[in-house]
Every structure is written in structure tokens, then in C-alpha cells.
Design a protein with these regions (language model features):
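C-terminal tail/sorting-segment detector
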Residues: 439-461
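Short, intrinsically disordered, charge-balanced linker/junction segments flanking boundaries
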Residues: 56-58, 74-78, 453, 458-461
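Acidic, glycine-rich segments characteristic of secretory precursors and extracytoplasmic regions
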Residues: 1-69
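Serine/threonine-rich, low-complexity intrinsically disordered segments
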Residues: 44-47, 386, 449, 456
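Compositionally biased Ser/Thr/Gly- and acidic/asparagine-rich
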Residues: 10, 70-431, 440-441, 456
Length: 461
């Protein structure tokens, strides 16, 4: 049987898995035995070039990898003179078909079809797994049919049944990880992937946080031919969760395109502690966005409804451009108003569905941004920049100063929305504000009103 896997035109990594066991080599199959028919096969490069079956380049850098589930590390394939075994997952840099010019790093990508001829896999398939608590394992679809990865994990032993990690080649420059929450079919960044693993596709799964031995067995009953169409994105029980998706966008060909993102789901059944319901972040090749909770980077953070003391710090790494923007998706959300806090510029922007916030990359980008929350009862205007409150944090009994205006109305509220009386005096180019009652330790909300703007600042005592 000859199987075919269509690959759209883009120079990017793909997570692939043959559904046949071959009696011929990788070279004779995916490399078309060095054939040069348009739209068929691809170049595969590696150490010592043609000696090991690879296509020769000036550097012979590897483009085909396997993942050692035992050690948890990528390993370059050392030869394409070996045969395929159905269900073996690979990471392959697909440049295009075999007419691509290997002498340049920027050839025009072309679509292609990867073919493999052999015996179809039937019966059970049990991959070797990473047995470390919380360890990741690379698993391929062994069948020439869609597989419901949710039912696979539900039947597994000591595996995290709520999350799976795809590689989406359409994201960013070379592709990026998409984290799929299997309990509600939400992804950290908008993507067409769903719970149905396509023929020829591979994914990462995660072991539960336990030392007990895990096992996964993919069976014929996990095939899902009727429901396996790719490109379907569904959300089940949408009213059960408040959703906040943070998308990082870059300007490509004069269009803003989402290249990375993270997702927060809000429900009082969740916790602000990191639990098995959260999805940890896998490292990307290019830009990387995650929420940070308890020193853990999360692609999907499942948290209870926030209070005014709640924060979702954003970690931002591997920036390749100068200019970006945040784009937000907010749905079914009820609770304290979310704001994007820029710690570098000391600005707050209310997060609404579809809102965008441009920014320029700096060396402080890694922990520059966070999501904070303010009481809905205050009916706050958007935060604006230009005023600075200090000291912040402050000690109980201290005054604070508002720099940037000497003619403003200053009011203070506690987190319950109760007014705190204050005395306000002009001190040079600042206002000295002194509460007239003893304050308890906690969060207070300072409102500064001028003729042209209103600013709300969180003050910590």
C-alpha cells in the first residue's frame, strides 16, 4: 500500500508519523530515491550527506529528528538508509519538493506530497513513554485513519488526560506549539487542530505528576473515521468557562498575524495553584508567550474567578522583531475587569474582546507585562499614562505622592469599593496624599481626576 501525505507550501517543521512499515528505506520513500518530480518528496539532510542517504548541502545540518522518550531529548536521525516503522514519530524540516534549491536558505517554498509504500499497521500499538513525573512523550498515529487522542488518553494509565501538544506549521516563521485542552477543546492560540489525530501526524502527550509507571495503548477502537476531518474547531460547554486568550501578533506583509499566544480559563472549580488542569508550556523555536504561576510557565492557565489581588504575569521570550502588538479574545467572562499592565511604561489598558495594544520590544520584555484586575463596581475609565504614584508599595501610615499633576482630585477606595478619606496638599510638582484613617495592609485603588483624564492606580500598603 502506498500512502500519501500532502504538505502545503511553507518552509517549516512538521510532526510526521508513517502509517506503514516499509521494506525499503526512508530515502526511497520520502526522498523519492533522489527523484526530481515536481510536487513529490522532499530533501532530507544530515551528517556525512550522501554517505548516509542524505541530500548533500554545504553544511549537512540535520533536518530529520526523532525524540528519545526515555531521555526526553531530540536526536538527529543518523541515516535515511533505514526503513520506516509505522507509528514512529519524526520532526522534519520540509523545505518543499525536491526541486528546491538547497544552496540558498531562502528558496521559494513549494507544496509537495510525501509517499511511503509498505504494510499498513493493524492491531494495538504501545509506544515507549517518558516515565518521569510530568514527562513529555512524542507519539505518532500508527494508522491510516484519524485517531481520537482523547479516548486514547482516557484509556491510558497514569497519563495527563486533559492536554495534548500539537505542532502547527502555520504559526510564526517555522511553526509553533499549540496546546489543546481536551476537556473543552480550547487552544492556547487559535488553531485548526482538534482531538482527532490525522493519519501521518504526531503529537506530544504528558505523563501525570506521579512516579507510577504510565502506559498508552492505541487500539483499533480509537479510530474515528467519521469525525476525523481536520480543520474543525469546536468549543464544548462554552458557558462553563470565562475565556481570555492573549495573542502575540507581528506585522508580516503589512498584515498583523498571530504568531503565539496563551490562554486563561476562569471557573470557580479551578485554583490559582498549578494543578493537573493547567497545561505547561513547551519551548518554541521562535517567539514564546506563557502565563507564569508559581514559577511554572503555562500555555493554558485554569484559574478561579479573579479578585483585585490576582495577577497573571506574562513571560515573553525569543523576540525577533522590533514591533509587536497584543490582541485579546475575551468571552463568557464575568468578574473583575482585566487590564494589561505594562510595568515598563506604568500604563494600564482595559482588556476587551478584540482589543489590541502595540508595543516595541525591549531587553525587559521577558517579564514586562501582566494581567491585573480591578473591581467592576468602580466603572473605571481606561488607564492612561503620565501620572506616577510613589512610594508603592508603602508602609501603613505613610503618605503617598502623585507626580505629574498639581491640580487633580484624588480619591481612594478599598477593594470593597468603600471610600477612604484623605488630605491632599500640593508639594512642588506633586500632590501629597495622606489617609486620615489607619489603613490595614492590602490593596487600595487610587483615582486621580484632572480636567482631561482619569487614571486609576493600584496602591499596595
Amino acid at each position: 500500500v502506498t500512502t500519501e501525505r500532502y504538505i502545503p507550501a511553507k518552509r517549516a517543521f512538521r510532526f510526521l508519523s508513517p502509517s506503514v512499515t516499509t521494506s525499503t528505506s526512508i530515502k526511497l520513500n520520502w526522498q523519492e530515491n533522489e527523484g526530481t518530480t515536481a510536487g513529490l518528496g522532499t530533501h532530507i539532510t544530515g551528517v556525512d550527506g550522501a554517505t548516509n542517504g542524505f541530500d548533500t548541502t554545504a553544511t549537512n545540518n540535520p533536518s530529520l529528528y526523532t525524540f528519545n522518550n526515555t531521555s526526553g531529548a531530540w536526536e538527529a536521525v543518523t541515516s535515511t538508509l533505514t526503513n520506516f516503522t509505522a507509528g514512529t514519530p519524526y520532526r522534519l524540516m520540509v523545505r518543499g519538493d525536491r526541486l528546491i534549491n538547497l544552496s540558498t536558505n531562502t528558496p521559494t517554498a513549494t507544496e509537495t506530497v510525501l509517499r511511503a509504500t509498505g504494510t499498513l499497521k493493524t492491531g494495538n500499538f504501545s509506544p515507549t513513554l517518558n516515565q518521569a513525573a510530568g514527562g513529555f512523550s512524542f507519539v505518532g498515529n500508527p494508522y491510516q485513519a484519524p485517531v481520537n487522542i482523547k479516548t486514547v488518553l482516557d484509556a491510558a494509565t497514569y497519563m495527563n488526560t486533559g492536554v495534548v501538544y500539537y505542532w502547527d506549521p502555520t504559526l510564526n516563521a517555522r511553526g509553533g506549539y499549540v496546546t489543546l485542552d481536551l476537556t473543552n477543546n480550547n487552544t492556547n492560540v487559535t488553531s485548526n487542530f482538534n482531538q482527532y489525530l490525522q493519519p501521518g501526524q504526531a503529537v506530544f502527550v504528558k505523563k501525570a505528576n506521579t512516579p507510577s509507571a504510565a502506559s498508552v495503548t492505541i487500539t483499533e477502537s480509537h479510530k474515528s473515521v467519521a469525525n476525523g476531518a481536520a480543520g474543525v474547531f469546536r468549543t464544548t460547554s462554552p458557558n462553563d468557562y470565562g475565556l481570555l486568550r492573549v495573542n502575540l501578533q507581528a506585522n508580516t506583509n503589512n498584515q498583523w498575524q498571530t504568531i503565539e499566544g496563551s490562554l486563561a480559563l476562569f471557573n470557580d472549580n479551578f485554583s490559582w495553584n498549578v494543578t493537573s488542569e493547567d497545561a505547561t508550556k513547551m519551548s518554541n523555536l521562535d517567539e514564546e508567550v506563557s502565563f507564569v504561576q508559581n514559577n511554572t510557565s503555562l500555555a493554558i492557565a485554569c484559574v478561579s474567578l479573579p479578585s483585585v489581588t490576582s495577577e497573571l504575569p506574562i513571560q515573553l521570550n525569543n523576540l525577533r522583531h522590533s514591533n509587536y502588538q497584543w490582541q485579546f479574545e475575551l468571552a463568557n467572562y464575568q468578574g473583575e475587569r482585566p487590564y494589561l499592565y505594562d510595568t515598563q511604561n506604568n500604563t494600564y489598558t482595559e482588556i476587551t474582546n478584540g482589543a489590541t495594544v502595540p508595543f516595541t520590544a525591549t531587553t525587559a520584555a521577558a517579564n514586562r507585562f501582566k494581567i491585573v484586575f480591578q473591581p467592576s463596581a468602580l466603572n473605571a475609565d481606561d488607564f492612561t499614562h503620565g501620572l506616577v504614584l510613589y512610594p508603592n508599595p508603602a508602609k501603613a501610615g505613610d503618605s503617598f505622592y502623585v507626580q505629574g499633576s498639581t491640580a487633580a482630585e484624588v480619591t481612594v477606595y478599598n477593594v470593597l469599593g468603600q471610600h477612604i478619606p484623605v488630605q491632599v496638599k500640593s508639594q512642588g510638582n506633586a500632590l501629597q496624599v495622606t489617609p486620615t484613617q489607619t489603613l490595614s495592609q492590602g490593596i487600595y485603588l487610587v483615582t486621580v481626576r484632572t480636567e482631561v483624564k482619569t487614571q486609576h492606580i493600584k496602591w499596595i500598603v
